[in-house]
Each structure stands twice: as structure tokens, then as C-alpha cells.
Amino acid sequence: MIDSTQFPVLEQRIWLNHAAISPWPATVISAMRAFVEDNAAYGPLHYSAWLETEQRLRQSACRLLGANADDLALVKNTSDGLCLIAAGLDWRPGDAVVCSEGEFPSNLMPWQQLPPEFVERRMVPFDPHDPEGALIAALDSKARVVAVSSVRYDSGIRLDLQRLGAACRANGTLLVIDAIQHLGAMALDVSELQADFIVGGSHKWLLAPEGLALFWSRPEARDRLKPIQTGWRMWPDMFNFERRNWRPPSNARRFEPGTLNTAGIVGLEAALELLLRDDAVERERRLLERSGRLLHGLSTLPKVHVHTPVDDARRAGIVCFRVDGVAPQAIHKALIEAGIYSAIRGPSLRLSPHFYTPHAQLDRALEVLADALQTL
């Protein structure tokens, strides 16, 4: 089990905002500090060591996802990966992209930039009781892409990816998954999903710095994407600067045109090394236990309406709620004054512990919330 001393934030505040940005663990801080000091003293003289760290990251990311290295790329962020798909796919006149209403902007804007006279943007209502049903009902011969968040940022509802993937595959529709609220929180094995593209950034549940994301693509789907950027680093012999017979590689490195975020790579490699010390299913169990503890506590408070399902299969690490007659800003302020950090999303307050959050901190948050509701 991962030692709690890896998380210095526990000694300073109650952090229930991992769904936004996570504080770095000690091992990430140490790795980043060593990289900065090495770079300051030696510049690029240890570049080969940087490449070794990058290779370890790729191996760890493959373990995290159950993926093949040829199918995994390192991109700048979740938006970057989604834009690579939206801009690079070989769209045909009359194609449609299907999304649920209320998606995070990263999974809306790339599709909205497609010419409407060429690609139909099909927005379907989000049904919290059957989120896959409306998407599946929207499938027809024109539905080229279904783009979803595997865990909703504004409610914590987790989609049944197996059910949705099977329906998309049967219809010949590509399934694109924004997994930023999933990776590091819930177990995910690409071999068990009928997905085509999965992308998720590093700075939330993966406990790493901003500026990097994992981008997985199924080979048959990847072949349909034209690289929208090219550069020296996408070739297997990338240090052959005199090469002129450029052809995009068939593997996912075709999406890595130029210099990568080395500092981010160092941080994410350290974070994944830490996360992979524990079994992914065990980490998921511990996180569900913690989000469930919050759900139970909230259910005992008057005027509180929880938007997150109780069913383990339908939730992850996010718990969202609202209080009758009380603005979320007021609750948010009361929690901050007690050293408890959460987030406001729409009309709701969002709490997002991680697998390492102590039960005592969750109970303290519920206690502060109960006291605040008596005066607000």
C-alpha cells in the first residue's frame, strides 16, 4: 500500500479537489527538483537520461492502460488529443458527431469547429439514469463519431463504456473517450473496451504536472487520421536530421511531431511509478469507499440534494451536491475558511477526494458542512 507520507498536502489542508488539479506527491516533487537542478547545472548533457525517463513513462502508461506501446502517444493535454481526432479524421459529407449536452468544453469545442454544412453536430440530452441510452438511440448510418467523457465532471456519473462501445462498434461508429476524470481514479483496460480513441491529461487523478496527456488509439481507427502536424521527432530515427524521405509512421508516434514536455514527462513518470505500486482495482476500491463515505454523510444533511449516484458502477471519485436556498459560493467559502478545498461547478459544489484521503478528513469536511448549513 502506498505510504501516506507521499502526500505532504495531508499535513497542510484537506484537499477535496483532485478533479481539478491534484497536489503533487513527494516522489513527484523529488523527481522534478532533481530534473530542474540537473538541467541548471548541465543543460542537455544528460539528454540520453531524459530519453530513458521518457521510455519508462511509456512503459508505465502501457501498464496503466493495458495498452501496446505502438498505440500510445504523449500529447500536450486532453484538448490536444481531441483536436487531433476532430481535425484529422477523414470526414465525409453528411457525417455526424454525437455528444451529450453538458460535456466539458474540451470535448465540445473541437467538434463545434467542424463546418456545419459538412458535419452534423448531434447533441443529445444527458439522462443521468441511462446516460448511454440517449447516445445509442442517436446512432444511425450517418453517426461517424460518438464523443463522451467516461466520468462527468459536473456530476461524477460514470458511463458504462462496455455497453456504449459495443453499440458503437456494431454501428460502425468511432467511440472517442475523454478519460481525464477516469485515469488514475478508476481502473481502465483498453483490451476490455471497444473504444477507438482514449485521451486523458496528467494533472488530475494521475497526480502529475499539467501539460501532458496520454493518447491511446486503436490501430484500425488511427489509420483514418491524417496527422495535422509534422515534425522531426515523429520518425523512428529522429536524430537523422538529413533524412528527406518523410512518411508518417504507422504507430501512434505520428502524433508527436516535436519536442515533448520533458519536465512533465519526469513528473508523470514518477507519479505513475507511485500509482502502479498498488493494484488499480484496489485503488479504485479505496476511492469508491471514500466517495461513498461522503455520499452517505451528505444524505443525512437537511436540504442537501446529491447528484452523484450511490451505485459503485455509476460513480468514481467525484461527489456533487446542491443545497436548497444556499448558493454554492457560500458553502465553498465556509469550507475554505476551515482549510477544506472543493470546487463549484454550475449550481453544485463538487468534492473529489483521492484514494489516499484519510477518513478523518472526510468526516471533518462533513462536520464543517453540517455546521455551516445551520448558519447559511
Q: Across the structure, where does each feature detected by a protein language model lie?
A:
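Pyridoxal 5′-phosphate
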Residues: 1-376
